[in-house]
């Protein structure tokens, strides 16, 4: 059996899931991820990342891309619907732009195939920020940004704080970046146009995450995560 693993966004959802059955389903889905789900919002993710990397100035260009995606009828029904969903996501993200402050940083994207994560209580948590924020003078990494897209499972503000906290700890402790600013650790819940930053204090939240990962590992190996 594969070792227990979970994406950081799903861990954030798990932390605030309202029912045991929802937590059970999250673990089950991580055991057998669906390829078509992982492929969703590809156009939106690429467009938003490019927009941030270029300095977040060309909003009209981003909206024009959303319009083209919405009008395109090429490919399968899934491809058409996914482009429409990506267009919706882009238009929603535009509403959140003013809450993202790059400060003295430049935004740097990472290849989508790059594996980035950490072990917490025996569970591999895939962190994979969409953007790193690097000080344009010193070159030091000061923060990161992670996007969350699904309309059906938006991150609550509490869940997003857990995601931002774990991302901050990953950069500081796993990568050894000593200049990380919690105010530059962003989580954007795209469908709700909500922007959350990591809280200043993180020890208690990381303890909560550790306990949750212990629970995930138990579900993973006991078979209780099965749908």
Predicted regions and their residues:
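Metal-dependent nuclease catalytic cores that hydrolyze phosphodiester bonds in DNA/RNA
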Residues: 1-107
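Short, charged/polar micro-motifs that form catalytic or ligand-binding hotspots
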Residues: 34-38, 76, 80-83, 117-122, ...
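Short N-terminal helix-initiation segments at or just after the protein's N-terminus
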Residues: 68-79, 126-132, 207-211
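Well-ordered, non-membrane alpha-helical segments in soluble/globular domains
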Residues: 86-89, 160-170, 203-213
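Hydrophobic, Leu/Ile/Phe/Ala-enriched alpha-helical segments that form helix-helix packing faces
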Residues: 90-98, 167-178, 216-220
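Active-site metal-binding core of divalent-cation-utilizing nuclease and nuclease-like domains
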Residues: 106-136
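Nucleic-acid nuclease catalytic cores
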Residues: 135-201
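Domain-level recognition of nuclease-like catalytic cores that cleave nucleotide substrates
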Residues: 182-227
């Amino acid at each position: 059996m594969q070792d227990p693993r979970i994406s950081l966004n799903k861990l954030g959802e798990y932390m605030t899931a309202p029912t045991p059955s929802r937590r059970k389903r999250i673990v089950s889905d991580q055991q057998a991820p669906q390829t078509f789900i992982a492929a969703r919002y590809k156009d939106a993710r690429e467009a938003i990342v490019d927009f941030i990397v270029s300095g977040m100035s060309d909003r009209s260009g981003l909206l024009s891309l959303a319009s083209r995606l919405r009008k395109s009828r090429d490919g399968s029904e899934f491809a058409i619907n996914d482009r429409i969903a990506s267009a919706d996501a882009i238009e929603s993200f535009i509403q959140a732009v003013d809450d993202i402050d790059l400060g003295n940083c430049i935004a740097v994207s990472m290849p989508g195939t790059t594996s980035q994560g950490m072990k917490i209580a025996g569970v591999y948590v895939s962190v994979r920020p969409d953007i790193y924020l690097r000080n344009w003078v010193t070159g030091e990494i000061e923060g990161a940004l992670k996007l969350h897209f699904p309309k059906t499972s938006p991150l609550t503000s509490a869940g997003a704080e857990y995601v931002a906290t774990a991302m901050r700890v990953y950069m500081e402790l796993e990568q050894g970046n000593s200049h990380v600013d919690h105010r530059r650790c962003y989580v954007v819940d795209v469908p709700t146009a909500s922007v959350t930053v990591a809280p200043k204090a993180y020890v208690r939240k990381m303890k909560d995450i550790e306990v949750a990962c212990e629970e995930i590992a138990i579900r993973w190996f006991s078979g209780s995560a099965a749908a």
